[in-house]
């Protein structure tokens, strides 16, 4: 389905990392139940947004192929040294036609199907710049999930300046802006694969 002429929210799949704990493979292309992790995420994220972007610094052709049914655009970081998720965020914020960008890592195949709606509701209610997911477990322990967030694209210039200054920490940059935390009780929905063992655990979920 073509993207709306005036989209309100762009979905950004963050697939540009090094995956150093997985021998440098492209995590988004690793298989879970015979399907690339990135495709699992796209199937959940794309229905929640108006346009879809994929931040990928490698294998752009492969990402274009698997995301073709979603009419996604493939983008790359402006710097070549894998500077981390903030660089992917910046690329997405600058490429988006929408005023808001909802981001998700490429290795979280069970992300909530109401993620964007809940982040948007909190962003609007608090008139915030950023809405970030926070999981809460059975013991009431809160765990921020900074790469699951909704951000205003008007923050792009400030982010570019911080990256140019050498800042790479996502939460440190969020702290510069009005950020609202949105609680999610199903922490399993945010499980990801940072190692081969965690990928195997996802398959057993």
Swiss-Prot record:
Keywords: Cytoplasm, GTP-binding, Magnesium, Metal-binding, Molybdenum cofactor biosynthesis, Nucleotide-binding, Transferase. Monomer. This is Molybdenum cofactor guanylyltransferase. GO terms for biological process: bis(molybdopterin guanine dinucleotide)molybdenum biosynthetic process. Mg(2+) binds at residue 107. CDD domains: MobA (cd02503). GO terms for molecular function: GTP binding; metal ion binding; molybdenum cofactor guanylyltransferase activity. Transfers a GMP moiety from GTP to Mo-molybdopterin (Mo-MPT) cofactor (Moco or molybdenum cofactor) to form Mo-molybdopterin guanine dinucleotide (Mo-MGD) cofactor. The N-terminal domain determines nucleotide recognition and specific binding, while the C-terminal domain determines the specific binding to the target protein. GTP binds at residues 14-16, 27, 77, 107. Belongs to the MobA family. SUPFAM superfamilies: Nucleotide-diphospho-sugar transferases. It holds the Pfam family NTP_transf_3. The keyword RNA-binding does not apply. It is an enzyme of class 2 (transferase). It catalyses: Mo-molybdopterin + GTP + H(+) = Mo-molybdopterin guanine dinucleotide + diphosphate. The keyword Transferase applies. Its main location: cytoplasm. It is found in: Cytoplasm.
């Amino acid at each position: 389905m073509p993207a709306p002429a005036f989209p309100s929210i762009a979905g950004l799949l963050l697939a540009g990392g090094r995956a150093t704990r997985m021998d440098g493979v492209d995590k988004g292309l690793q298989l879970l139940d015979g399907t690339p992790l990135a495709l699992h995420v796209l199937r959940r994220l794309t229905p929640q947004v108006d346009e879809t972007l994929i931040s990928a610094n490698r294998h752009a052709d492969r990402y274009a192929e698997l995301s073709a049914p979603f009419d996604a655009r493939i983008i790359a970081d402006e710097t070549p040294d894998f500077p981390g998720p903030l660089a992917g965020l910046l690329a997405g914020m600058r490429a988006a036609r929408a005023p808001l960008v909802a981001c998700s890592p490429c290795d979280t195949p069970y992300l909530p199907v109401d993620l964007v709606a809940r982040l948007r509701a909190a962003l609007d209610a608090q008139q915030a710049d950023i809405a970030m997911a926070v999981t809460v477990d059975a013991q009431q322990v809160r765990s921020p999930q900074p790469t699951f967030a909704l951000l205003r694209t008007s923050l792009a210039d400030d982010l570019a300046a911080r990256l140019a200054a050498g800042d790479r920490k996502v939460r440190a940059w969020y702290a510069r802006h009005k950020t609202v935390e949105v609680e999610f009780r199903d922490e399993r929905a945010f499980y990801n694969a940072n190692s081969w063992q965690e990928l195997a655990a996802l398959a057993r979920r």
